Amino acid sequence: MAKAKFERTKPHVNIGTIGHVDHGKTSLTAAITIVLAKTGGAQATAYDQIDAAPEEKERGITISTAHVEYETKNRHYAHVDCPGHADYVKNMITGAAQMDGAILVVSAADGPMPQTREHILLAKQVGVPAMVVFLNKVDMVDDPDLLELVEMEVRELLSKYGFPGDEIPIIKGSALQALEGKPEGEEAINELMDAVDSYIPQPVELRINPFLMPIEDVFSISGRGTVVTGRVESGIIKVGDEIEIVGLKDTQKTTCTGVEMFRKLLDEGQAGDNVGILLRGTKREEVERGQVLAKPGSIKPHDKFEAEVYVLSKEEGGRHTPFTNDYRPQFYFRTTDVTGTIKLPADKQMVMPGDNATFTVELIKPIAMQEGLKFSIREGGRTVGAGVVTKINN
């Protein structure tokens, strides 16, 4: 049977299942596709198809991720599910699968467990804007008081990590019953998808955000001036717009006097376009790879920040030994490497390969930076870690 093409008439949202191992994330993912397939909103996908997730590489890190897509009455969703806990950690820190929202799966029989906490904390650190809770395996709990207790625990945990625990929708159900086609099982899935539709906000389109373009290359064109090339990360750039060159050196102001793509002149470049931008009165040596062009005032250069980082294991091609305080690797932001020094928290002596950790970094040169910015840690040209800026310190 030929696959039907998804018509992109509905708004698109990226979502993922998170939660403790064996609480039913993959069963729930399968159940959503199977229930929505009945109304033509999905291709029914079996549990073992999702569980045998293919490996992908993101910034030199191998991650197993399963992707399914489905639609509700209101939206089109791309849904990621990871088989292992380490895959989740890597996925969230590298941003390999951008999440506009998450479904936190908690087993009603067990209540919140260590990875439940860790996934909520990570979601907060990496800026997942909203989540909905599916209290799974309720068919295994006979005592309604116990269900209420687990729900209270989950709400307290969400509040503790900065999510609005009191208002987050918690749907009770059983993914297994839904997979077996039982009406109460399917009903809970439909209720969950209604909650996801209404509670998880529609992401802001990249075009609407302020203009930002990381500089990849700089050329001088005789008689015309300096051209910088790169891929527009967000926003729109028009001929005549004032822009700032931010990072590595003092911020400079300039004006865009031309935008071209595939050697053709354009009126504007927008998020996703690979463009060349002609800068008025800027000399070739005043601009370099690693800086960004940005809407004036929208982003500032910083050299001190806190980060949540995943350190590659030896098997993944990372370091063979732990690192300690004052470790000085290269931090690769957008298009360039900058040396920085790592300061570990007082209670941490070292970070082992395969760990995730929170620490402070001090760069030798400032980089255009905002919270949520992703980076790689490199040593001698190979990736040894991946991180996300969680807080700017200066």
Curated annotation (Swiss-Prot):
Coiled-coil residues: none
Start and end residues of each tr-type G domain: 10-204
Keywords: Cytoplasm, Elongation factor, GTP-binding, Hydrolase, Magnesium, Metal-binding, Nucleotide-binding, Protein biosynthesis
Organism of this sequence: Rickettsia rhipicephali
Recorded catalytic activity of this chain's protein: GTP + H2O = GDP + phosphate + H(+)
Predominant localisation class: cytoplasm
Positions of region (G2): 60-64
Residues reported in the UniProt entry to bind GTP: 19-26, 81-85, 136-139
Name of the protein: Elongation factor Tu
Summary of subunit composition and partner proteins: Monomer.
Annotated region described as G3, given as residue ranges: 81-84
Annotated region (G5), positions in chain: 174-176
Record-level Gene Ontology MF annotations: GTP binding; GTPase activity; guanosine tetraphosphate binding; translation elongation factor activity
Family: Belongs to the TRAFAC class translation factor GTPase superfamily. Classic translation factor GTPase family. EF-Tu/EF-1A subfamily.
